[in-house]
């Protein structure tokens, strides 16, 4: 998808780097990355999908302005899809549906699209939420586009849809206020707080109080 420099090392399960996550093939702890595209910084959060990690899911969703609902083109919505999608719809997020793995043998992207629509309707999505854009593609082969039968050369279509449909964060003036959703540690920088600035701005070297 041309998101990495030529000298960067990439691999499978880049965000699911916890040993247990790799072993079980699921996301347990939320991860966040960012990319710059057409002059806009896009922050991407990978959230757990299982109800066993509901607290983590709710904390992460409060950081987001929109969501990508990733669905397998063969399997369709999974049981855990219902849990996370319900949480996202309840707080008013409008989803972009991404039907992935259309390169799979016997995949059924059109039927899966209808299954996603029915699921959202069943979860009492608003008319605006039901009017969701849908993207088809193959993450394995590095492409996303509007038509599953016509592969593109990259994932730029997905990024363009994010810029078009996900609203920019609201800028509230005042003293800095940040909701911390997770803590990390680096041997180079020490403790790291990850979260969202809800009011004011934070600058490098600023003294802040953590409460």
Give short role names for the model-derived ranges.
Residues 54, 78, 113, 155-159, ...:
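Hydrophobic face of alpha-helices
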Residues 61, 66-129:
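Conserved C-terminal guanine-recognition region of P-loop GTPase G domains, centered on the G4
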Residues 54, 105-110, 148-153:
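Ordered, soluble secondary-structure elements with a strong preference for glycine-centered loop motifs
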Residues 59, 84-87, 196-198, 211:
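Short, solvent-exposed amphipathic alpha-helical segments in soluble enzyme
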Residues 50-51, 74-77, 101-107, 139-143, ...:
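Conserved nucleotide-binding/hydrolysis micro-motifs of P-loop NTPases
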Residues 121-211:
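Conserved catalytic-core segments of large NTP-driven translation/proteostasis enzymes
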Residues 1-71, 75-77, 84, 111, ...:
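P-loop NTPase switch module centered on the Walker A-proximal segment
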């Amino acid at each position: 998808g041309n998101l990495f420099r030529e000298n960067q090392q990439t691999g499978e399960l880049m965000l699911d780097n916890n040993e247990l996550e790799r072993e079980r093939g699921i996301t347990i702890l939320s991860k966040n990355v960012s990319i710059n595209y057409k002059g806009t910084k896009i922050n991407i959060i990978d959230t757990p999908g299982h109800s066993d990690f509901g607290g983590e899911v709710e904390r992460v969703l409060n950081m987001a302005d929109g969501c990508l609902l990733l669905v397998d083109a063969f399997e369709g919505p999974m049981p855990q899809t219902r849990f996370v999608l319900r949480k996202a719809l309840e707080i008013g997020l409008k989803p972009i549906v991404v039907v992935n793995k259309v390169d799979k043998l016997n995949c059924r992207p059109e039927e899966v699209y209808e299954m996603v629509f029915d699921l959202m309707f069943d979860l009492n999505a608003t008319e605006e939420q039901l009017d969701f854009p849908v993207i088809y593609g193959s993450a394995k082969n590095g492409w996303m586009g509007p038509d599953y039968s016509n592969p593109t050369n990259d994932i730029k279509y997905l990024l363009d849809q994010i810029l078009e449909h996900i609203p920019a964060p609201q800028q509230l003036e005042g003293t800095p206020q940040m909701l911390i959703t997770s803590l990390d540690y680096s041997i180079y920088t020490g403790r790291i707080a990850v979260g969202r600035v809800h009011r004011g701005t934070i600058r490098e070297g600023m003294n802040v109080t953590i409460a």
